[in-house]
């Protein structure tokens, strides 16, 4: 049996957990509700903050985690994923794009995003960078259930 565990601040990780729960017919729990000594395999869904996956370190039964789904704004980047995989000691890592609701951010997070946005405005000019900057500045949603397809395929073949 598998349980989906998520850490969510703005709602994207929770939405992906609920979509995955329906597709796998598996329960999903917020990170604070995982019982000690859980016997199920765990699929963890958390959001990216730099190279960290928020909430992953809070799982006390880390040996039960069979895969991690990382939620972020940027397009998939293999080099960044390799860094995240290494820094978080995750073998089976998947990536999906999420949403940003600026109302859910703390002051420090808004400040940091403002700095990143200015840097992107000055140095990054690709259409993808402009899309991410727009979502960072105004909020927006890049999530879709079909982004879970690579994970679902992997899960069915393991």
Residue ranges of model-derived segments:
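Residue-level signal for well-ordered alpha-helical segments
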Residues: 1, 36, 70, 125-128, ...
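N-terminal beta1-alpha1-beta2 submodule of the flavodoxin-like/Rossmannoid cofactor-binding fold
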Residues: 1-62, 149, 153-158
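Generic alpha-helical propensity signal that fires on short helical segments
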Residues: 20-22, 60-62, 84-86, 111-114, ...
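Helix-loop-strand module that forms the ligand-binding subsite of alpha/beta enzymes
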Residues: 32-108
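Glycine-rich phosphate/pyrophosphate-binding loop and the adjoining helix
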Residues: 112-158
């Amino acid at each position: 049996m598998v349980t989906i565990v998520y850490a969510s601040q703005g709602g994207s990780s929770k939405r992906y957990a609920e979509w995955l729960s329906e597709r796998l017919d598996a329960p999903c729990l917020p990170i604070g509700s995982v019982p000690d000594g859980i016997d199920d395999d765990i699929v963890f869904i958390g959001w990216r903050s730099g190279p960290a996956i928020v909430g992953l370190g809070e799982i006390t039964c880390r040996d039960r985690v069979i895969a991690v789904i990382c939620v972020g704004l940027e397009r998939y980047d293999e080099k960044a994923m390799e860094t995240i995989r290494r820094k978080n000691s995750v073998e089976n890592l998947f990536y999906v794009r999420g949403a940003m609701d600026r109302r859910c951010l703390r002051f420090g997070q808004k400040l940091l995003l403002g700095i990143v946005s200015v840097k992107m405005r000055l140095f990054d000019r690709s259409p993808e960078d402009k899309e991410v900057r727009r979502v960072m500045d105004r909020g927006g949603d890049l999530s879709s259930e079909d982004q879970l397809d690579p994970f679902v395929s992997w899960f069915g073949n393991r």
